[in-house]
Amino acid sequence: DARGLWGGLLVLGKAPSSFKGDVTELQIEGIPVTETAGLYGGSDAADDSGVMQYISIRHGGAEIGEGNEINGLTLGGVGNKTVIDHIEVVANVDDGIEFFGGTVDASYLMVYGQGDDALDIDQAYSGTVDNAMVVLTAASDHGMEIDGPEGSLAGSFTVKNVTIKGASK
């Protein structure tokens, strides 16, 4: 499958996230540090970044540099008033969907043939992922990557009703 034909979708909010040095905002991967529109994080757990439903994100992603990639869907500090459901990510260069902190719930997710992790959780994400399916291909690294907080803010998330089908390599 073709990959990297375009960047990806980034949604940035003002919900709590755990950063090194306990700063309240951070620049998201993939956006130059000179762009203030790339900041995410804050203290509003109920932050509302809108509604994303019935979206297919295909053949995107980019590796800009070491530790600086664009995922199919990047959620940075997105709050729990945001609606995210019925999202499909197909053949992305890096992660399918990555949660950088935040409190948003996401349901009915499908990730197919991503290059790195299908679902990636970082920076004290504190929402729920429910009803997700992951299909790994020979190009895929992992079904999930889960990292803890980077600062003192702790998070507690729930992952339920997830199916991961491995690849034959």
Regions found by a protein language model. Give the residues of each.
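Beta-strand/loop edge motif enriched in small/polar residues
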Residues: 1-169
